[in-house]
């Protein structure tokens, strides 16, 4: 009869790896939440700065939620297994404080760029946490997890960010009822990028996660939103788009996309715990 290895060193190592994995996954989930909130804040503040007072209550609520998310991420990172370099976390906190204090005095496109830089930093941290916390465990047990990690932590967030930027720019144009040359070029580019990224995502989902229904559920709303922007902004002699409608349409899609990220993270989490048990 073979006895199970219950040496303290093995059990302690397993416990330490479990705690590190759990903290890493929780940090990743809160980074996703923070990024989603910052994207929403960018779009709402752009609309407000363009002249739509209707977004002020949203902005105030978003800022409270962002503060809570930042606090929780910072507290997590102060525990035994930090996965975010302290200098990078400090940069995110400081950049947000700068935005929170001064956004009402910013020009619309400066506000757009400040937010976009901060969101890019959050997405880079998301990928860093994935590389540090998840990739070693998952790829050690099954190399096929690489494609799933790329889909959840690279492809989907990139696609979401392009659509979130398009939300901000198109809503801004709809509020002011004018589309300058630069805005026209940026919106056209983002539509093409979004269409191509979405095509790639659908193909990846059909291969990797045929049971992942969330990516499939927003296909018709996404096509409708992109067509609305094309027809009422890019191809119309006068901007006829309704700013509130564009913001709501795009936000519903973005929220569903972030739910798809959460669904992917849950699959990865389940696989990581199974791999840990087998280690």
Where are these regions (language model features)?
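Hydrophobic alpha-helical segments
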Residues: 1-279
């Amino acid at each position: 009869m073979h006895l199970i290895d219950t040496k303290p060193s093995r059990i302690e190592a397993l416990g330490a790896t479990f705690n590190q994995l759990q903290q890493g996954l929780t940090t990743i989930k809160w980074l996703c939440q923070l990024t989603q909130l910052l994207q929403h804040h960018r779009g709402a503040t752009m609309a407000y700065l363009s002249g739509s007072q209707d977004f002020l209550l949203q902005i105030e609520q978003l800022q409270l939620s962002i503060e809570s998310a930042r606090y929780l991420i910072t507290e997590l990172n102060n525990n035994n297994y930090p996965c975010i370099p302290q200098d990078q976390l400090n940069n995110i906190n400081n950049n947000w404080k700068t935005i929170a204090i001064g956004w009402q005095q910013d020009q619309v496109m400066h506000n757009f760029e400040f937010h976009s830089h901060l969101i890019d930093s959050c997405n880079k941290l998301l990928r860093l946490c994935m590389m540090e916390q998840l990739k070693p465990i998952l790829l050690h047990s099954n190399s096929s997890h690489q494609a799933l990690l790329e889909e959840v932590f690279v492809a989907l967030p990139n696609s979401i960010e392009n659509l979130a930027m398009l939300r901000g720019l198109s809503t801004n144009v709809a509020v002011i009822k004018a589309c300058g040359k630069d805005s026209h070029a940026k919106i056209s580019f983002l539509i093409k990028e979004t269409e191509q990224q979405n095509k790639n995502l659908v193909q990846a989902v059909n291969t990797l996660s045929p049971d992942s229904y969330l990516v499939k559920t927003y296909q018709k709303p996404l096509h409708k939103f992109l067509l609305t922007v094309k027809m009422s902004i890019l191809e119309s002699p006068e901007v006829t788009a309704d700013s509130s409608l564009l913001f709501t349409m795009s936000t519903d899609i973005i929220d569903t996309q972030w739910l798809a990220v959460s669904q992917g993270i849950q699959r990865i989490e389940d696989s990581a715990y199974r791999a840990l048990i087998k280690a």
